[in-house]
């Protein structure tokens, strides 16, 4: 059960403010939705041979266009990725308020231009749109800056919500050569607001034959002329949906057949060259951050994943949603026996006072992971493991003066959307926790806890249902070798491969191979204590996070943890760490009677190792060839020219080898989105992260960060 958000804070804008920011496109046209549907059908027909159709939309409006795209998609063998750019972030609560009060989801009569208009029935419900609207609301879009990826129907429909300044959002994305944007819909209230630079950024992201459609151009000849010229100057053909819908029905007022133009067949060569220059500028500016080599086939043996935890399971799932098979190698008898083996793990975002790339990434990642849990729970695979979880919220409190100052900086640093987190006083904290804490805190209403190994197992089961995904248990890969035709995996007795692509997602063993042993990442031991649910303690109703964490009960036990020991010598049970976990709770909430209910006498605990990076970002991307980096460094160091060299030269890497790890203690939040981004890279699809954040995830970043500044390694 999701924790009850602070609803008065959720809807900060009244209805009049909402309709001003998110206006209905054609509320005076009783047939608008029918016209929109006809136009959208023609878009899908024009690109019916593509397995993945990428569409762009400028403006969310009242959401009707988004829902109609979703409803109109009818080809079961085609996937849709719809990228919506909206300057004003909105959350699910405000979106529902907008729909409820505007009656946006109402039935209308079909558009029939040869017949007299019929009166629409304004109060009849549109069940087909209402159902999709509820599905969208259940995904809990939040009012954060950046991209939120929403995946529906086992990957058949994906919606990227890009909130924030449109020019900033467009320019932050890279062109996807294999899967560019094929068509744009621009809502009329944003036509004049788009900067000329935004037009070119749209062109950069588009297929060379991509077109633009909008609504109501013919109603304002001045707007029509200036708008069309702007976009034509970037190589686009611009059409009006009203005219397209009439033409699509075949005959105009004079009885003459009118073809529907949805593909720009003769773009200007000079303008196309200018687009290509923009793309090359991007490539050159981020040459130090090489992308994955795109998979050339979907054969079952094309990709191997080493690891049996959350990272490997979610990579397999993200690949499977794209129809891509994979073979997963796990050294244990069951999945999720490493860092993913805990009974309960907290899921909530890592926030910083500055809301920097780290903070924004973790908000996106946390929300993505939360939606994954919901999707795997609501539409499980056949015989799928159920995922024990409870989105009961996470309550963060301070445990000393220093941590209080840090928490205050976070709370006061940004106007955080209250669906992400909001401050509570001591009385509110007690009410949320259902036990006495008697101190203020920061509450994450959408957070909670998830069972990691069940989460991993459910993801694998779903992946195996969707594509040719296999899992080899009890298979300890001891060495990997690069050969002319791919990567070969070796155990004591067996040999697997070759594989065109190999992903190392093996948690604590991430650095065990020659090709990965130089990664700048450290193992940290963590002992989680399991204590019986009894007396006052059993009433705990949210995850507590202070000096350590404490979960609500699950199957009669609470999880209390965790120790944090760098480069551990062993993974045996440690009585001292057990007592340290208890003392952390006493330091966090001193002199409270419920602390006496924490019974450690059973010495019940689990020990695991999490791999941690210094900057707290996961590692995701091409495996760096560190010896080659160091060799090149001998020739290019500590000069202005050397900085230019490292900036514009693709960094050395191991061809076909990728890293997915370093999830640290927040892998439940960060792992699924990191896996989704790597799957998108491997398949040549748009990635739901901006270019700067991708650089922060790159496994080579520790070396390149210094080299780009002209510093010594």
Swiss-Prot record:
Keyword field contains 4Fe-4S: no
Entry's localization field: Cytoplasm
Region (tRNA (mnm(5)s(2)U34)-methyltransferase): 1-300
GO CC terms, sorted: cytoplasm
Names of the cofactor(s): FAD
Stretch list, region FAD-dependent cmnm(5)s(2)U34 oxidoreductase: 306-713
Residues spanning the signal sequence: none
Job description of the protein: Catalyzes the last two steps in the biosynthesis of 5-methylaminomethyl-2-thiouridine (mnm(5)s(2)U) at the wobble position (U34) in tRNA. Catalyzes the FAD-dependent demodification of cmnm(5)s(2)U34 to nm(5)s(2)U34, followed by the transfer of a methyl group from S-adenosyl-L-methionine to nm(5)s(2)U34, to form mnm(5)s(2)U34.
Protein name stated in the entry: tRNA 5-methylaminomethyl-2-thiouridine biosynthesis bifunctional protein MnmC
Source organism (scientific name): Shewanella baltica (strain OS155 / ATCC BAA-1091)
């Amino acid at each position: 059960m999701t924790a009850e958000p602070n609803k008065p804070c959720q809807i900060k804008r009244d209805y009049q403010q909402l309709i001003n920011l998110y206006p209905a496109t054609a509320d005076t046209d009783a047939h608008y939705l029918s016209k929109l549907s006809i136009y959208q059908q023609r878009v899908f027909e024009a690109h019916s041979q593509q397995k993945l159709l990428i569409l762009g939309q400028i403006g969310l409006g009242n959401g009707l266009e988004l829902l109609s795209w979703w409803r109109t998609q009818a080809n079961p063998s085609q996937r849709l990725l719809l990228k919506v750019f909206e300057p004003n972030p909105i959350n699910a609560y405000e979106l529902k308020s907008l729909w409820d009060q505007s009656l946006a989801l109402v039935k209308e009569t079909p558009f029939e231009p040869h017949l007299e208009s019929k009166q629409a029935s304004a109060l009849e419900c549109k069940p087909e749109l209402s159902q999709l609207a509820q599905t969208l609301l259940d995904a809990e879009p939040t009012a954060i800056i950046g991209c939120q990826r929403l995946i529906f129907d086992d990957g058949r429909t994906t919606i990227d919500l890009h909130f924030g300044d449109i020019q900033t959002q467009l320019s932050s994305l890279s062109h996807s050569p294999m899967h560019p944007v094929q068509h744009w819909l621009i809502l009329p209230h944003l036509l004049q607001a788009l900067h000329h630079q935004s037009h070119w950024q749209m062109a950069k992201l588009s297929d060379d034959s991509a077109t633009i459609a909008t609504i109501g151009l013919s109603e304002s000849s001045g707007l029509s002329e200036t708008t069309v010229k702007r976009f034509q100057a970037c190589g686009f053909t611009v059409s009006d949906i009203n005219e397209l819908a009439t033409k699509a029905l075949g005959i105009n007022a004079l009885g003459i057949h009118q073809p529907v133009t949805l593909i720009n067949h003769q773009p200007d060569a000079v303008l196309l060259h200018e687009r290509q220059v923009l793309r090359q500028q991007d490539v050159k500016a981020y040459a130090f951050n090489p992308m994955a080599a795109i998979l050339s086939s979907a054969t079952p043996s094309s990709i191997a994943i080493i690891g049996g935890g959350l990272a490997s399971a979610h990579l397999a799932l993200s690949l499977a949603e794209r129809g891509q098979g994979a073979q997963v190698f796990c050294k244990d008898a069951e999945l999720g026996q490493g860092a993913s083996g805990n009974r309960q793990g907290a899921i909530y975002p890592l926030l910083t006072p500055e809301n920097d790339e780290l903070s924004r990434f973790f908000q996106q990642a946390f929300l993505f992971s939360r939606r994954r849990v919901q999707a795997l729970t609501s539409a499980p695979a056949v015989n799928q493991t159920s995922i024990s979880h409870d989105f009961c919220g996470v309550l963060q409190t301070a445990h000393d003066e220093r941590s209080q100052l840090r928490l205050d900086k976070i709370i006061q640093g940004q106007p955080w959307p209250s669906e992400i987190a909001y401050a509570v006083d001591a009385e509110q904290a007690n009410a949320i926790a259902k036990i006495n804490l008697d101190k203020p805190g920061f509450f994450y209403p959408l957070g909670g806890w998830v069972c990691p190994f069940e989460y991993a197992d459910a993801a694998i089961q779903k992946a195996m249902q969707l594509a040719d995904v296999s899992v080899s248990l009890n298979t300890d890969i001891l060495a990997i070798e690069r050969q002319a035709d791919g990567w070969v995996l070796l155990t004591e007795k067996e040999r697997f491969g070759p594989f065109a692509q190999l992903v190392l997602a093996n948690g604590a063993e991430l650095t065990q191979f020659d090709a990965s042993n130089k990664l700048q990442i450290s193992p940290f031991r963590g002992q989680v204590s399991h204590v019986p649910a009894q007396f006052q303690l059993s009433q705990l109703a949210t995850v507590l996070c202070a000096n350590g964490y404490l979960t609500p009960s699950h199957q009669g036990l609470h999880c209390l943890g965790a120790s944090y020991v760098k480069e551990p010598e062993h993974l045996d049970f440690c009585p001292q760490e057990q007592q340290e976990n208890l003392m952390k709770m006493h330091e966090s909430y001193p002199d409270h009677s419920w602390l006496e209910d924490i019974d450690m006498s059973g010495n019940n605990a689990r020990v695991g190792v999490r791999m941690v990076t210094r900057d707290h970002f996961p590692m995701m991307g091409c495996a760096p060839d560190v010896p080659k980096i160091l060799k090149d460094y001998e020739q290019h160091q500590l000069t202005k020219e050397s900085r230019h060299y490292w900036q514009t030269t693709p960094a050395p890497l191991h061809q076909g080898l990728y890293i997915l790890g370093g999830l640290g203690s927040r892998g439940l939040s960060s792992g699924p989105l990191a896996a989704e981004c790597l799957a998108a890279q491997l398949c040549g699809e748009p990635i739901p992260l901006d270019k700067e954040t991708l650089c922060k995830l790159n496994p080579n970043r520790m070396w390149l960060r210094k080299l780009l500044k002209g510093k010594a390694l």
